[in-house]
Amino acid sequence: MTEITKLDPDVAIDLAYDIFLEMAPEHLDPADILLFNLQFEERGGVEFVETADDWEMEIGVLIDPEEYAEVWIGLVNEQDEMDDIFAKFLISHREEDREFHVVWKK
């Protein structure tokens, strides 16, 4: 089995944020987009997190957490915790065949 070259966290964050900006208008409520735009400079966060192993419930496909990076985009509270998540991204580490899945705020 070949070794997977993992995405650099900064690259994963940039990819997720670019996809978020492109797709958010189609997937988020207009009020959430307005809230995000008004609050992002002060409270916004884009975090590279440990890849969860429960993505199968979200996307209907079993994944190997070692093969994907997970990034959350949202707003943080006074305790510096992300309490309003607008999107969770799952991005494959495979550069030649990049896949991504997004769970949008409902």
Curated annotation (Swiss-Prot):
Pfam families from the UniProt entry: DUF440 (PF04269)
Superkingdom as given in the UniProt entry: Bacteria
Positions in coiled-coil regions: none
Task performed by this protein: May act as a double-stranded DNA (dsDNA) mimic. Probably regulates the activity of a dsDNA-binding protein.
HAMAP family referenced in this protein's UniProt entry, alphabetically: Put_dsDNA_mimic (MF_00680)
UniProt family annotation: Belongs to the putative dsDNA mimic protein family.
NCBIfam families documented for this protein: PRK05094.1
Protein name: Putative double-stranded DNA mimic protein PM0536
Taxonomic lineage from the root: Bacteria, Pseudomonadati, Pseudomonadota, Gammaproteobacteria, Pasteurellales
